[in-house]
Amino acid sequence: MESIGDDDELRSKTVSLPRRISFTILLLLLLISLSTRVSGSLDKSGRRVIEARTGQDLIWVVQLSDLHFSVHHPERAIDFKNIVGPALALINPSLVLITGDLTDGKSKDMLTMKLNEDEWLEYESVMQDVVKRSGLNKSIFYDLRGNHDNFGVPSVGSSVDFFSKYSINGQMGRKGNVNTITVETSERKHLFVGIDTTMHIGLRGPTNLFGHPTDELLSSLDSHLSQWDNQSAKPVAKISFGHFPLSFTALSHSQKSLKDVFLKHSISAYLCGHLHSRFGKNLKRHHHSGGISLSDNDLFQLNMRQSGAESTSNCSFGALPAAEFWEWEMGDWRKNRAMRIMAIDRGHVSYVDLDFKSKPQKTIILPTFPLDSRFMSTSFARHKYECQHMISSSYDAIRAIVFSHSLVVEVVARVYDSSPGFDNLVMEAPMRKHGGDSSSSGATFFSLPWNYRAFEDPLPDRFWLQIEVTDIKGRLTLSEMRPFSINGLSSKVSWTWNEFRVMGCQWAALYYPILWPALYSLFLVFLIPKCIIIVFKKQYTLKKFIAKKGPITLVLWILQDLCRMPVVWFGYMAYLFYLIFFPWFSGEVFADSGDRAYMTIMGWVVTSSGADRKHEYIGQPDVMVVVIPHVVFVVIPSVLVVCCLVAEREIYKDHIRTVSGKKEDDHDRGRKKRSQRRSLLFSNRRLFRKSVLLASLALYWKHFKNCWALGRAYEMNVVHFPGYSLVVPLLLLYVICKTHKVP
């Protein structure tokens, strides 16, 4: 009996074992599936894939930038908490991208720049609240490091690297400089690649202004952007996002750029921040592989679109449209409370910028097709039109997303023909809602079938689209009027001067082209007249200038008089050599380390933390914010002031001789008349000299402010930068005293 019982027990254990294994496997599969639904799949390289929740070939994301949370301005964080959480709950995006400058890192007087942990604690707390109030998964938030988040950080992972500790990326374990997430619909993959191009050794400001992509980062970016090229049967829309615009991004060590990689992959757009809204609303730039820039080195781009960017498409078999992408800088949260919603609808990229500072956003309208002809990727659109590759399903309807706190009862699309006037309405019709509960608010997709070929026209801004939304409370909301072009032609938009200054100038490449001509010009100012005196034995004097007037004679006379003041001539020559070959000052560039580095025109010389403890230059071209203003707005003006003082002394001396009758020549009536004409400026009152002295006082004040700001920024006093701070004021003072009395 015992043996029979043992057999039954053994049989029951044998039967139950496969059931347990099967149950365990099913449980694991269920957990994996649940995890994938919540946060997407994650491969070993940190490349996530999530499924879009829209049910259509349509996604939208939110971008925020330049939050600048500050202990001195608590309203920034308070407004962010009160506004952004509910807004995200309404918008319900697939991703939330925060493109840098999460905290401010500045003292109250804005001169000392290093990270403040209290600001990071506030950022962490606010983001936790925003995630909770939005109802979104924390994993869809991507925040990037900006230059303000890197002030005084000697290395990633150091004790003052608060970004790695308190940011969402840091807490989610996203440690690389390149992070990728793919949002997938049934028809398309949408690849988003975030890049951190901040300095690998973070200096304090103000010499921490530019993005610094390394060759390793560019190689990694290239790899991430190409991850689906040979693996997906679906088309791929590519978007990159970072903090720095390309105009404030340096080249890598091998002289490669982000622009090269972006054009190689013909991404749709590069989203960035950094510049803020104070420079203008059109901080956008179109990059095109076939465009013509002002110079071979791409130092300038005069217009938002490059010249020659709209060539005829090549429609031969297998030919692709010319590589292009848009660079879209967005406004800041710091002062303007800006937010951007960007949508990709069947491959068409559009966006709307929101301003939460001026008015509450009860209803938001984002037209997704037709695209705004001012900011569309025209090579792609024109290639499809001219080569008849247009997919009718993506062109056959006007489409828009409406985000509303209240129930939307009517959406009307209107098309205006601007050729006879701006009020010629040529189409007006209600749009039809797609999906969702008819009694619900939130994000809703609307469309209106139309005959798009009726709007083909060689003018890119003839037809304009506007959408009107009426909610259940009777509130009317109008979208911004925007031109569109079915033909894929671009409508021209011009930069203002400020917009061109920050977007059209490649500042990293302009550093040396500005610096060296300025320094060479100063050398020539002092060397040419000296050589004329020594080598050619020619003397230029006031008497010679009066006899033979001309700009060259005038300049040579003044400069030769300057050469006859040896203290001034040798002083400036020595100072110019000092500026080129010697350190300008020694300051604390890292937060709370106490270690000092010294700055030259080539960058900051710091001692690396590696075993070899080698010295390396960092912060080039960032040091241009110190070097260029000093050379152009202090040294050069001081030379002009000195020349004016020297010239005034000679003219006044001539005036005194004429009036007193002690001139060596005969008393010439013509000279006396000229002396009388000059008497007002060069009489005993010496009004011209006084005006020059006022200019020198303004120069003193500017130089003092620069010295004060640098002293506060890098914890320096006069001992740490005597050459930078004292030479120009002392030379000016010497000339003022020397030219005061006329023998």
Curated annotation (Swiss-Prot):
Residues 1-40 form the signal peptide. One of its GO terms (cellular component) is membrane. Its EC number is 3.1.-.-. Keywords: Hydrolase, Membrane, Metal-binding, Signal, Transmembrane, Transmembrane helix. It is a multi-pass membrane protein. The keyword Signal applies. InterPro entries: Calcineurin-like_PHP_ApaH, Ig_TMM62, Metallo-depent_PP-like, TMEM62_C. A divalent metal cation binds at residues 66, 68, 101. One of its GO terms (molecular function) is metal ion binding. The chain crosses the membrane at residues 514-534, 565-585, 623-643, 687-704, 716-736. It is an enzyme of class 3 (hydrolase). Its cofactor is a divalent metal cation. It is found in: Membrane. Divalent metal cation. Its main location: membrane. Pfam families: Ig_TMM62, Metallophos, TMEM62_C. PANTHER family: HELICASE RELATED, TRANSMEMBRANE PROTEIN 62. Belongs to the metallophosphoesterase superfamily. This is Putative metallophosphoesterase At3g03305. It comes from Arabidopsis thaliana (Mouse-ear cress).
